């Protein structure tokens, strides 16, 4: 399949739904969100796109703010996961790294590149793992 980005950091999926690409069977449109910044208003935009038949894939999300840092908003994150599961939308969390920021899945003190355990994960990493 082909993933197609949408305007405004892959948030304007409702705009893409107004004029989708024609003649292709293997296209999905990307949606990005950070639960600390993007709430129900962005889910409403996604719902409008879904209502028009636009296939969506979340190719980047986190539960920090949009900077990739700040506090984790697990309440809003859970609302997003419920929305994605209800609408059968697949998703990828950002970011599989050990950078010292809220959106890193691996603790900054961890240097190994494989065979991580729950002890190696950040709070965000453990939260995301619990969703699978």
Give the positions of each predicted feature.
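Extracellular glycoside hydrolase catalytic/binding regions
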Residues: 1-90, 94-98, 103-131
